[in-house]
Swiss-Prot record:
GO terms for cellular component: cell surface; extracellular region; phosphopyruvate hydratase complex. Mg(2+) binds at residues 244, 291, 318. HAMAP family: Enolase (MF_00318). Pathway: Carbohydrate degradation; glycolysis; pyruvate from D-glyceraldehyde 3-phosphate: step 4/5. Its cofactor is Mg(2+). Its EC number is 4.2.1.11. This is Enolase. PANTHER family: ENOLASE. It catalyses: (2R)-2-phosphoglycerate = phosphoenolpyruvate + H2O. The gene is eno. InterPro entries: Enolase, Enolase-like_C_sf, Enolase-like_N, Enolase_C, Enolase_CS, Enolase_N. Coiled coil: none annotated. Belongs to the enolase family. It is found in: Cytoplasm; Secreted; Cell surface.
Length: 434
């Protein structure tokens, strides 16, 4: 039977050694689902609230016992006593949103609500004897995503003196996900050898990318291009580049202040100058995607950027849209960006996550399913990417098990789909004039 009989949460650790929420759901027939909730370092101010204890005597204030208690003492009784079916995802998500009663899930915590939401879906898939991607996407979920591999970390994700947070490679010329993953791994290892030859650090950041002390953005880009070529691939044909600028991290009082991360050598740019700079970079290098090129509240700057280069480059809104349909609809109406980053914990339920993906795709925007910098062994986002035919996934570099777990899950899914599996490569960027 599909009736949920038990919902239980506990405090566990994420990839940074910080507490996070794990939730387990059990049905009367024995179907079981478990979910672990991720956490971000650079967060948009409009994201749903991640509830932390604030008790400095435990985990430096980052404990999540309040969120755990909210699951065990508030959400669980509502679900169990309400005799909810594990198959009724939308009703359960709606009930939790109403139980919270705030616009940003600040009462119960998005980390509490999301843990339950995903665990319910996993238990439902278990009940039906289906893999999660098939339960979520039906027979139509069959497109494997192009991986955005973050092989150099900067900004808030490392101690490297570079303002941009992520430098990514996208193996769009591969014929399968399996091949794209191999290309990425080969480039990653070639990059490591190049860094070693230069006497640069090969320690990795939060998302598994290297965090060396490059001389600046262009030094990082040119070194990555050398690694692509050394691995035997053609930049701008086989493999493209991408940035996550995370501009909100260095934007203040109308100025994009690169000195925050780059010191005295960093520039200070107005919105117009920031647009000019990004346009200059895409003219010089094979860049296909730029995330958060402007501050989340600089909508005028975003409009300038979109009008200027939105037909040539994917412009992804992360802090801008925060997986929120209300904000995304305004962006679509005003012609802001052409893509949305999808982070399940930015909004807090699977139902709202799928609503955001559907809205984006109907408007001709792409949807990039994404991890967070604080991750776990949970692989749900891999299944979401395939279930929704998102076509793109951003889940870190080619190191750290918390990142590799998602790639390995996608390999399993591709094998299971066999001849029905699709990998669209460059066609996944349907928002661009190619």
């Amino acid at each position: 039977m599909p009736i949920i009989t038990d919902v239980y949460a506990r405090e566990v650790l994420d990839s940074r050694g910080n507490p996070t929420v794990e939730v387990e759901v059990l049905t009367e027939s024995g179907a079981f689902g478990r979910a672990l909730v991720p956490s971000g370092a650079s967060t948009g101010e409009h994201e749903a609230v991640e509830l932390r204890d604030g008790d400095k005597s435990r985990y430096l204030g980052k404990g999540v016992t309040k969120a755990v208690e909210n699951v065990n003492e508030m959400i669980a009784p509502e679900i169990v006593e309400g005799e909810f079916s594990v198959l009724d995802q939308v009703s359960i998500d709606k009930m939790m949103i109403q139980l919270d009663g705030t616009h940003n899930k600040g009462k119960l915590g998005a980390n509490a609500i999301l843990g339950v939401s995903i665990a319910v879906a996993r238990a439902a898939a278990d009940l039906l004897g289906q893999p999660l991607y098939k339960y979520l996407g039906g027979f139509n979920g069959k497109q494997l995503p192009v991986p955005m591999m973050n092989i150099v970390n900067g900004g808030s994700h490392s101690d490297a003196p570079i303002a941009f947070q992520e430098f990514m490679i996208l193996p769009v010329g591969a014929e399968s996900f399996k091949e794209s993953l191999r290309w990425g791994a080969e480039i990653f290892h070639n990059l490591k050898s190049i860094l070693s030859e230069r006497g640069l650090e090969t320690a990795v950041g939060d998302e598994g990318g290297f965090a060396p002390r490059f001389e600046g953005t262009e030094d990082a880009v040119e070194t990555i291009i050398k690694a692509i070529e050394k691995a035997g691939y053609k930049p701008g044909e086989d493999v493209f580049l991408g940035f996550d600028c995370a501009s909100s991290e260095f934007y203040e009082n109308g100025v994009y202040d690169y000195t925050k991360f780059e010191g005295e050598h960093g520039a200070k740019r107005s919105a117009a100058e920031q647009v000019d700079y990004l346009e200059e970079l895409i003219g010089k290098y094979p860049i296909i995607t730029i995330e958060d090129g402007m501050d989340e509240n600089d909508w005028e700057g975003w409009k300038q950027l979109t009008d200027r280069i939105g037909d040539k480059v994917q412009l992804v809104g992360d802090d801008l849209f925060v997986t929120n349909t209300e904000i995304l609809s305004k962006g679509i109406e005003q012609g802001i960006g052409n893509s949305i980053l999808i982070k399940v914990n930015q909004i807090g339920t699977l139902t709202e996550t799928f609503d955001a993906i559907e809205m984006a795709q109907k408007a001709g925007y792409t949807a990039v399913v994404s991890h967070r910098s604080g991750e776990t062994e949970d692989t749900t986002i891999a299944d979401i990417a395939v279930a929704t035919n998102a076509g793109q996934i951003k889940t870190g570099s080619l190191s750290r098990t918390d990142r590799i777990a998602k790639y390995n899950q996608l390999l399993r899914i591709e094998d299971e789909l066999y001849e029905t599996a699709k990998f669209e490569g460059i066609k996944s960027f349907y928002n661009l004039d190619k």
